[in-house]
């Protein structure tokens, strides 16, 4: 069962001209969800990427990152929208495919030198992922790799992230469609 075939495409959401790739159809299917987590688990057990912690980006990055943390025996750190974390935070603004936003992480989330796998559901412009990477680095962490279910290479985020020197991995690409 290809992962791509389980992802719903919604035109003109959240605004006209955007083709939204909805992973809820993938993760509601227990076979599809297991395939995602098993595929990522296998990659990180076998590929030699060294990391200590998983950092997941709100909200869908929590779903994938939490399950992956469990299967790999790693801790999980959330990157959240403003006002959702109870202790002292560091913030980072960023641009989206369809606007701008801000995310936060606890100031004490990572110890200096902690290597992290940064996880989210989808890579489009790269703005959210780069903002999360900046947060990880602000609190002393090091991004070992970024992992996504879906990559939209035509939007340019993959190249932008690679140009900044980060390694990325995605399970499937939606190119030109």
UniProtKB/Swiss-Prot annotation:
Broad EC category: transferase
Pathway(s) served: Purine metabolism; AMP biosynthesis via salvage pathway; AMP from adenine: step 1/1
PROSITE patterns: PUR_PYR_PR_TRANSFER (PS00103)
This protein's UniProt keywords: Cytoplasm, Glycosyltransferase, Purine salvage, Transferase
Gene Ontology annotations for the cellular component aspect, listed alphabetically: cytoplasm
GO BP terms, alphabetized: adenine salvage; AMP salvage; purine ribonucleoside salvage
Recorded superkingdom: Bacteria
Role description: Catalyzes a salvage reaction resulting in the formation of AMP, that is energically less costly than de novo synthesis.
Similarity comment: Belongs to the purine/pyrimidine phosphoribosyltransferase family.
Name of the molecule in the record: Adenine phosphoribosyltransferase
């Amino acid at each position: 069962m290809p992962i791509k075939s389980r992802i719903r495409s919604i035109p003109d959401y959240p605004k006209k001209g955007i083709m939204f790739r909805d992973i809820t159809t993938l993760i509601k299917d227990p076979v599809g969800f297991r395939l995602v987590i098993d595929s990522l688990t296998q990659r990180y057990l076998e590929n030699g990427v060294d990391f200590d912690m998983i950092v997941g980006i709100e909200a869908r990055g929590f779903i994938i990152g939490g399950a992956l943390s469990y299967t790999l025996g790693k801790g999980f750190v959330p990157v959240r929208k403003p006002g959702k974390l109870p202790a002292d935070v560091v913030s980072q603004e960023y641009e989206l495919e369809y606007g701008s936003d801000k995310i936060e992480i606890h100031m004490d989330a990572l110890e200096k030198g902690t290597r992290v796998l940064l996880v989210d559901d989808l890579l489009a412009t790269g703005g959210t992922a780069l903002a999360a990477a900046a947060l990880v680095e602000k609190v002393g962490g090091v991004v070992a790799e970024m992992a996504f279910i879906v990559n939209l290479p035509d939007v340019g985020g993959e190249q932008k992230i690679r140009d900044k020197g980060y390694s990325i991995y995605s399970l499937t690409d939606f190119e030109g469609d």
